[in-house]
A protein has these predicted regions:
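Acidic, Ser/Thr/Pro-rich low-complexity intrinsically disordered segments
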Residues: 10-11, 17-27, 32-153, 158-167, ...
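Sec/Tat signal peptide C-region and signal peptidase I cleavage site
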Residues: 5-9
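Proline-enriched interdomain boundary motifs that mark the N-terminal boundary
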Residues: 181-192
Length: 193
């Protein structure tokens, strides 16, 4: 038996190998120090290139406001992030504003020994604007809620600035948009000859 894996070499540290999010809460227990094979992220608010990154994707099912909180398991850890609309250009279009524009990013962080804590998109946590950072001069740690439309697909990159391996949670519970459907998969029709 021959099996060809079309995803050979793809890693969750690259957009093409991203984890598909399909629930309100995702826990990443093993953050990475890997940057993948492709340096996709050169976002507006990040002071440096992509580093120690993990990629996630989701497709909006119902219009609304997108909100998420990235909460480090260790409050001293500093996570930066960028969000891309990949509906038209896919992962290949990242870095090309017309194809897969960056719609939000945050690289705000405090200097040790101050804890960095959570970041993300959350107006209810004081979020403003759509591009905050870099460093401790251009906050806050949260961006304003983002209007999203059914059918749009997004890629979220989370970068592990402190290079900790402790991980984080991503919580979409404040979103008014539905990001995943609750319809169980149905078996495809088939015929027996």
């Amino acid at each position: 038996i021959f099996y060809a894996n079309p995803f050979y070499g793809q890693t969750i540290s690259d957009c093409a190998g991203a984890v598909v999010l399909c629930g309100d809460l995702y826990t990443e227990t093993e953050a990475t120090l890997n940057t993948g094979d492709i340096y996709e992220y050169t976002g507006a608010c990040n002071a440096s290139l992509e580093q120690s990154s993990l990629w996630y994707t989701f497709t909006v099912q119902e219009d609304g406001l997108l909100s998420f909180i990235i909460d480090p398991l260790n409050p001293m850890d500093d996570y930066d992030w960028g969000l891309f609309d990949i509906t038209t250009g896919g992962c290949e279009g990242i870095g090309t504003p017309v194809l897969s524009p960056e719609v939000g990013c945050n690289s705000f962080g405090l200097n040790p020994p101050e804890p960095n804590g959570a970041t993300g998109i959350s107006s209810s946590n004081g979020g403003t604007g759509n591009s905050n950072g870099p460093g401790n001069l251009n906050g806050p740690a949260f961006n304003a809620d983002l209007p999203v439309v059914s059918g749009e697909t997004y890629a979220l990159v989370v970068m592990n600035w402190t290079n900790s391996l402790e991980g984080y949670t991503i919580d979409f519970g404040q979103s008014t948009a539905s990001l995943y459907d609750e319809i169980p998969p149905a078996p495809a029709a088939y015929s027996v000859d």
